[in-house]
């Protein structure tokens, strides 16, 4: 996955991923055309927590779940459960979004 081939949701007057032009060579675009409409699942993971079933059952409304990340630390962005990028949480018009700050290359998943 080349960094210049990725498009992402951008906010504040910029294009959304669905509106962004696809910048691929003619041969590459023709080769990939059959998969352009295949849906993918994108997840932005704020952090993770481990606990026992007993601790889980004690959680209720108002409980605080402490995550393994610090405030301001990059979050992981997954496409179909595969880590592809890291980013920062942003707020735009009362909605959450993610600004991608790092593209993860194959084999650099650490």
Curated annotation (Swiss-Prot):
Membrane topology annotation: Peripheral membrane protein
One of the protein's GO biological processes: bacterial-type flagellum-dependent cell motility
Source organism superkingdom: Bacteria
Record-level Gene Ontology MF annotations: cytoskeletal motor activity
Subcellular location: Cell inner membrane; Bacterial flagellum basal body
Similarity annotation: Belongs to the FliN/MopA/SpaO family.
The protein's role, per its UniProt record: FliN is one of three proteins (FliG, FliN, FliM) that form the rotor-mounted switch complex (C ring), located at the base of the basal body. This complex interacts with the CheY and CheZ chemotaxis proteins, in addition to contacting components of the motor that determine the direction of flagellar rotation.
Protein's UniProt name: Flagellar motor switch protein FliN
